[in-house]
Amino acid sequence: MLSKFVLLCLLLFVLCSSIHAQDAANPPDAQSNNVVVDPWQGLPMGLDPTRVIDLALEEGWRVNHVLPTARADDAVFVRRVYLDLVGRIPETSEANAFLECNNSGKREALVNSLLDTDEHAEHFAEVFDAILIGRTDAEQLGRRTKAHWIDYLKRFLRENRPWNEVAQEIVLARSGSTVDQGANWYLYSRNNKPQDIAEAVSKDFFGVRIDCAQCHDHPLASEIEQRHYWGLVAFFNRSKNVDTSEGPGVSESAIGGFSEFSNLEGKSLPNELVYLGNRRVEESRPTKDDKEEDRDELYVSNNDSKLKVPKFSRRGAFVENVLTDHPLLARATVNRLWGWMMGRGLVHPVDTLDSYHPPSHPGLLDWLARDLANSNYDIRRLIRSLALTRAYQLSSAEDKFVDPQWFTAALPKPLTAEMLQRSIIVALDPADPSQWNTLEHRASFAKSFPDVLAEESISNVAQGLLLTNGQSINDLASMKHSQFLRSLRDKHDTDSAIISKLFQTILGRIPDADEINQCQGYLSKRIDQRDQAIEGIAWAILTSSEFRFNH
């Protein structure tokens, strides 16, 4: 184990050497004030990722003459980390326990504790589900739950299984056991549409939007070619959904799937098994006069006649020759999790890992991707490293403009549908939380708040209608259903005490003088409707932008 002193010396040596070499070879653009600092290419593995991130970002601040905000206070941090790691605001008792603790290492201890909970696995299963499958209605949400997809994701996160192995299982879609059978849902849910599958696989596992290469080579990123699009489609165009005794499955034919595509010049080209980086899989291609015959000897024998597995499997070849050890798998994972924790990826948007969208810190992204691969694709370790960085623990910039690519301030992040719904339940404390967490309730929130890691956050009419007229929110924010509001009314005599408790419980902070005056004025005019007045203030806080964002 390297001592902190030796580590720092090593980092500074590599840093200074790399900066000097870069400055000599690539002088800054005289018309640009932004200098991309990339001293991390020669940095060895085995170092603490948190420390590497801190030093990389701090050097970027120095070179670009930008200053970070102050460290977020404990009240802001505890709300932020609960939302990011377990998908809800902290309960009052949890927040108070953290705020009253005087241990200097309490932030690290809290991060470790939250990452080891079932809530973390459940929350990130929802995040991965939204990223990999997308939003849907209550019926479809019920189907994917019944197909054990959600359980599969929870188990992977609870056991902290290597992400590359999980990715292979999902793309191969050949899990027959009840425990792993849920992995099949990713392909099954695409309903035998190989182009949809190819576009999803490229975006979800490699961070590359390949759909614009369907008709021609990518006009802005030359490394993405039309043959890569149709080559990726070919890996999946022999797949077919089947329903087995264990649930949804994806069979695969041993023949067919040979076609051609036309480029802009009208020339027809074969759809060879190839993807980005020219990772090609050789396959014997029949001539036009050859007639393929589907025979039993082309398949591996198995107990389920519906679930055919060919001896030469295109999906298997893709997993073995393309997905396994592909550098984009680690890069895409790092970038997406960075975006989740920091509010923006090192490459932005997060699904554009191409030459047209260079990373803000290219060497750092390279180093973190190699570090993730060397750590056996340990997702939890990466999340922990990000949560402990200086950048993650900065305060927000409030009204001051900051260039987000330098991560000099915490970027406000909109709560996902699940985070918002769960946080409302935690704040209002209904007697029966399950009543407010049905498939229908979850689907209504997901429909109105569909985005996860969106390029930009834009409120819409559906969100406004749900928050202002949604029956579930109005019902829950009532004395009838909220144990918190009833307790507030019964235990506190003064308006100031009620107002303070509302803000502390819902927003995790005390109200300022203007907020106290406004709320007191509202209550004083409704003495004969005190219950409704308290409900109104609670509803206003719950539907505020401050509550709907993680700051």
For the regions a language model picked out, list residue spans one by one.
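Positively charged n-region of N-terminal signal peptides that target proteins for export
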Residues: 1-5
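Metal- or metallocofactor-binding catalytic centers and their adjacent structured scaffolds
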Residues: 118, 122
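Post-BTB helical module
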Residues: 83-84
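Long, His/Glu/Asp-enriched segments that create or flank divalent metal/ion-associated functional microenvironments
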Residues: 425-469, 474-478
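N-terminal pre-domain segments of enzymes
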Residues: 22-58
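Primarily short, surface-exposed interaction patches in extracytoplasmic proteins
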Residues: 47-79, 89-116, 133-428, 455, ...
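Bacterial N-terminal signal peptides
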Residues: 6-17
